[in-house]
C-alpha cells in the first residue's frame, strides 16, 4: 500500500475529505523500507483512520534478511516501529521461522528482535513457515541446493540446518 507514498497520501486526503475516517477503521500492508523513506506517512495514515500497518520483517538476522533479499536491517525494523508508534499507528509485524537457511543462532536473533519490537509497541502477528512456490527465486536456490521438494501442490524444503525437532522445541521455550 505504501510503495507509492504520494498515492497513499492522496488517498488519505480523499478519505478525510469524504469523512470515511470517522466511520471506518482501515488496515493495510506496508514495507518497512517505505516507512523509513517516508517517515511522516504513518501519521498521515493514522489521521485518515488507519488503525494498523502489517509488515513482513521475516527475520532478525542480517544473513537471513540478505537471503530473502529484503533490503532492510533489524535497525530499520526498530525505526519503522518507533515511527508508527510515535504517530499513533499500530505496527503489526510477522516473521518466518525455520526457513531453509535458519540456524539456532538466527532463530534466537529473530526471537530477540520480535521481543524488542513487541516491548516497543509492535504487535507480533504470527510466525510462519516459508513456502517455496515454483518459479520464485527462493525455490530456484533450493532446487540448486537439492533441498526443494514437491508433493502434489504442496511445496516445501528439507529441514532446517542442524535443527532437529527436539532442538526446535528447546529454542521456543
Regions found by a protein language model. Give the residues of each.
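A structural motif corresponding to the C-terminal lobe/cap of the Radical SAM core domain
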Residues: 5, 12, 16-173
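Glycine-rich Rossmann NAD(P)(H)-binding loop
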Residues: 1
Amino acid at each position: 500500500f505504501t510503495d507509492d507514498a504520494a498515492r497513499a497520501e492522496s488517498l488519505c486526503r480523499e478519505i478525510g475529505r469524504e469523512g470515511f475516517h470517522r466511520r471506518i477503521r482501515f488496515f493495510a500492508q506496508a514495507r518497512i523500507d517505505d516507512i523509513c523513506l517516508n517517515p511522516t506517512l504513518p501519521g498521515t495514515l493514522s489521521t485518515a483512520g488507519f488503525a494498523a500497518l502489517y509488515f513482513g520483517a521475516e527475520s532478525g538476522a542480517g544473513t537471513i534478511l540478505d537471503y530473502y533479499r529484503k533490503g532492510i536491517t533489524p535497525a530499520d525494523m526498530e525505526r519503522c516501529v518507533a515511527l508508527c508508534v510515535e504517530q499513533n499507528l499500530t505496527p503489526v509485524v510477522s516473521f518466518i521461522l525455520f526457513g531453509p537457511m535458519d540456524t539456532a543462532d538466527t532463530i534466537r536473533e529473530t526471537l530477540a528482535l520480535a521481543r524488542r519490537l513487541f516491548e516497543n509497541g509492535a504487535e507480533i502477528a504470527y510466525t510462519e513457515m516459508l513456502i517455496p512456490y515454483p518459479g520464485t527465486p527462493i525455490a530456484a536456490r533450493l532446487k540448486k541446493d537439492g533441498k526443494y521438494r514437491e508433493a502434489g501442490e504442496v511445496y516445501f524444503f528439507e529441514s532446517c540446518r542442524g535443527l532437529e525437532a527436539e532442538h526446535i522445541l528447546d529454542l521456543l521455550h
